[in-house]
Amino acid sequence: MISLIEQLKTRFIQALKTAFDQDFSDLEGLVVPATNPKFGDYQSNVALSLAKPLKQPPRTIAEQIIKALDISDLCEPPQIAGAGFINLTLKANFLENLLAKIQKDSRLGVEKASPSARVIVDFSSPNIAKEMHVGHLRSTILGDCIARVLEFRGHDVLRLNHVGDWGTQFGMLIAYLREVYPEALTTADALNLGDLVAFYKKAKVRFDEDETFKETARKEVVKLQAGAKDTRHAWQLLCDQSRREFQVIYNILDVNLTERGESFYNPLLPEIVGQLDEEGLLTEDQGAKCVFLEGFTNKEGNPLPLIVQKSDEGYNYATTDLAALKYRIKEDKAERIIYVTDAGQANHFAQVFQVAKKAGIIPENIEVVHVAFGVVKGEDGKKLKTRSGDTIKLKDLIDEAVAYARRDLEKRLAEDDRKESKDFINHVSQVVGISAIKYADLSQNRISDYVFSYDKMLALQGNTAPYMLYAYARIQSISREGNIDFEKLDEKAKVILSEETELALGKYLLQFTEVIEDVEINLLPNRLCEYLYELSKKFNKFYENCPVLKSEDPIKTSRLILCDLTARTLKLGLSLLGIAVVERM
């Protein structure tokens, strides 16, 4: 189903062509959702936008548009308000027919994009020999949600995990382990990731304080880069150990990724520097090869270059990112590349993208975008850390959320004198705890920082995962109470929107397509969260005002269809956020 707003835009473009013999299809905000229900369902301020180019009063333009506008099958007669706003109210019978139609559609009216595109979403990207921490939470959850929405829309999505599996830290760690625990460099699973992290910290101290050790570590890096068998084997073991523990987190979060670390692009780095040189973009500055760009300066106001080869002839993140871009466009055939990292890397990616465009790595028809996000803060307003000041491990964060959800569930069961099985308690606690973490993150505008609070994210009221899950479970309880199978509702039954709350719910259900398309374009998952929250509230109002099981047919079946559509929309919407539902809470 083409979204309602797109259908209206198409009719307006046709009307403008008829009225003024011009193509205004590129006009922004041709039709938008009404700001207030008293103005109808949708509005157009196109008459005001065209007043200057057409040299006519807005109301006169609005009158001409309405005269040429053919929407009698969709809307009540359009109304002109104020200076020339055109207000549109959808017809109840049009809405009723559309709801009956999407009730039979497993995709709830959301069509696949045409044409579809090859899209790469680069997200999560932890570092080898370091545990995943709260800083990886947003990238992992946001990236997964964006990938899910794009996949649902029919795009060919490659989810890439650009892990930090190369660099000086490996020389440092391997050199240290050769001294204190050589077995770890030859035997799989000799260490767990926690041990690796502890050894890494000790190695870093030695590296910073001991010049002899620093030189030994550098030699290990050279051996690694040269492909020395023993060093390469040790590196592989360290990577494998980290990889296994990362996968535990990904399994818990139900996140799928294809790993392609920094090391994958190593053979391509000299070629990148050579290409930049051929394009005349390189400048040597204090022995380093750099690209100076317009609009980038340091704190002193001096030009800030992008270094692509250090004075010791080593490469860096920028070189690797340029090589990755080239590979993704040339070999992966990506048409859209999305990087999901914190806002602190915005400057880096802006520079990399500009250099890549100058060098011809990014053609004009390829979209590259940095999906930036803010930091997770504690309730003290500072970056979320442990009491000792350490970064919180992601696994600990998840475990605590699940434990919190369990305590809350057991408390409610005791208050209601309800008996449930151990399996039920375990399952619901796990789903609610993980869902709460995901939803708390995704419901915020990603650009903003947000405060992490177990109390708020696990509350049964407000814009939270438990509220959404409860709304879904409540609808399932209607089917159980009435012994009704939603899948066996009469396919020929009509939807009847006679009550105000029925009409409001029906209209809102039909906006799902618009929201999914919005997230697909603007990559802001919080808009899907806002929609689902508003849908839950509209359903609650409907349920309070419109008896379902106590009604008589055809009203009863119509209201059951609205219940079913709401539950399915919640379930589908939450699944696109990476959140599972529960039938009972």
From Swiss-Prot:
List the InterPro entries. aa-tRNA-synth_I_CS, Arg-tRNA-ligase, Arg-tRNA-synth_N, Arg-tRNA-synth_N_sf, ArgRS_core, DALR_anticod-bd, Rossmann-like_a/b/a_fold, tRNAsynth_Ia_anticodon-bd
The EC number of this protein is: 6.1.1.19
Q: What is this protein called?
A: Arginine--tRNA ligase
Q: Which domain of life is it from?
A: Bacteria
Q: Which PANTHER family match?
A: ARGININE--TRNA LIGASE, CYTOPLASMIC, ARGINYL-TRNA SYNTHETASE
Using the UniProt record, give the first listed, main subcellular location: cytoplasm
Q: Which gene specifies this protein's sequence?
A: argS
| Molecular function GO labels | arginine-tRNA ligase activity; ATP binding
CDD domains noted in UniProt? Anticodon_Ia_Arg, ArgRS_core
State the family it belongs to: Belongs to the class-I aminoacyl-tRNA synthetase family.
Report the residue ranges where the short sequence motif 'HIGH' region is annotated in this entry: 126-136
* Pfam families, per database record: Arg_tRNA_synt_N, DALR_1, tRNA-synt_1d
Q: Which UniProt keywords apply?
A: Aminoacyl-tRNA synthetase, ATP-binding, Cytoplasm, Ligase, Nucleotide-binding, Protein biosynthesis
